[in-house]
Amino acid sequence: MRNTMSRLLPALLLVLALPVAAEVRELQWSDLIPPGAPPPPPPVALHDLSQLADALEAEAGPAAMQQSPAAPVVEALDDVQVKLPGYIVPLDMSEEGRVTEFLLVPYFGACIHVPPPPSNQIVHATSELGVKVEQLYQPFWIEGPLRVEHASSELAEAGYRMDAQKIYFYELD
């Protein structure tokens, strides 16, 4: 009986711990801004086609300045298992042509076609599996442990880091 109990107890503890370990908190971009901090400015949109030539010329120039490179972050999110939707801005690729290091941003074109959003609206992520380059024009869910940690890249400053354990297409429910 004692031998059976000594085997059963660790198994029971493991089963009870699984729901806690597997719990993933779904975040929205507003959750990355601390209460009382200023909201991010709206993204710059190019709706006037008469400005298209100027915009294309600006693409060839130096990168636009980031809106707030040291924006305040939410410390309580450190080491929380999360999932966050967004767009991928590639930083590094594998030999197989998959993006393995990237910035996750809230809207398409951020850091590339328009100035980068504040640092608390950018997550610097790495992934062993990566994402195919041809899939980068659509939004994704990124899932993994979020760290409140500053990261610099050639495109922007990020207020958060993540080891992206799961990457999958964003679909409306």
What are these regions (language model features)?
Residues 1-9:
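Bacterial N-terminal signal peptides that target proteins for export
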